[in-house]
Amino acid sequence: MKFLSTLILLLSVLALVRGEQYNKFTVDLNGVCTNSGSLDTCTNQCGNAGGSFQISQSGGEYQYEQYATKDCDLMASLTSKFACLADEAPVTLGLGNIKITCQDPSNSASSPLTTAVLFVVAFAAAIALLL
């Protein structure tokens, strides 16, 4: 019984803390200019003269793509993968001159009702372990 309660508790907690998806980003290009963009949206950087960038996500990992054009229509001139650590926590790409701040997290897999049910199940499993 304790094994089953432990398993239910672990699965419930894992479901509650499953990865968040960040939907907005601020990109700082070496202090020269800062622009905000949304996930999967082509965004002009440094005004119309500076090209553009786009951030996409695949399996919890994000990818920054920089383009020479303002429409993201040619092959990316720079591509770099990164992970969002926390809301409003800046991530410096390996190149060192690009800082990305992940913003607007959402748990894309849970509705409030699902979260409440998982919390109740986890709480019940924890009580069962104590008995």
UniProtKB/Swiss-Prot annotation:
Localization of this protein: Cell membrane
How does this chain sit within the bilayer?
A: Lipid-anchor; GPI-anchor
Which keywords does the record carry? Actin-binding, Cell membrane, Glycoprotein, GPI-anchor, Lipoprotein, Membrane, Signal
Per the UniProt entry, the signal peptide is: 1-19
Propeptide boundaries:
107-131
Q: List the Gene Ontology MF annotations in alphabetical order.
A: actin binding
Attached lipid, kind GPI-like-anchor amidated serine, located at S106
PTM comment for this protein?
A: The GPI-like-anchor contains a phosphoceramide group, rather than a phosphatidyl group.
Gene Ontology terms: cellular component: plasma membrane; side of membrane
User: Family per UniProt?
Assistant: Belongs to the ponticulin family.
The task this protein performs is described as: Binds F-actin and nucleates actin assembly.
Q: What's the protein called, per UniProt?
A: Ponticulin-like protein M
